[in-house]
Amino acid sequence: MAYKEVTGNLFASNAMALVNTVNCVGAMGKGIALEFRRRFPEMFRQYQIDCDKKILVPGRIYSYMSKDRLILNFAIKDNWKYPSKIQWIEACLKQFAAHYQKKGIDSIAFPWMGAENGGIPLEIIQAAMRKHLQPLEGIEIEVYTFDPIAYDPLFEQLQKIAFSEDPDKYQTESGVQRKYYSQIIEAVRGKTARGMSEISRIKGIGKTTIDHLYVFLTQQLEDSEGRHQEKKDTSEIQLTLFEQ
């Protein structure tokens, strides 16, 4: 078991748990939180419901079990408008350290929490995370520095479609309008877009189109890996306080 810092894409990790960083007002509009929103839309919908009910508070961890991953939402902001606070990050790290063994977590992938949109200097984040995570035993810990063109299974799925004999046959199923779909395919084939973050920045393509693309690619990836499951009823589910 080990602690390691890597450069890559957190969503390519094989860890059983992935860490997302969230505010407590129901917005996932930037950075890694936006990626989690697009890749795990059911989790996002439940997160919004719980925020509306004022369930989330800063400095706590809220877990959500997706089809094949445990997602840990670290509440390191109160409102998205304001910076993260190092005391909230450390409070979450202490909770994780106190409860990960009881929860049976033997591998986890973190981003550098609060360093991108949280407004906290990276060196402060690194010192705090190393202090709390390096001593932990019986667990594989990966901390990711994001590389926008590193391997990403979702982008790989898009590449397979773009370079297939007839990529247009997927257009209707994708839910993406034809002109935007063609732009996306051309960007992948021409290598002007080398990752999902670059796809998101293609001129003229809006957030709703990108959301449709993520849903489609996620479904394609699940089907290709035999991970398709019936949609679960989340009407009676809320994010679970990690320490419970």
Task: State each model region's role.
Residues M1-Q244:
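Macrodomain-like recognition of ADP-ribose-binding/processing modules
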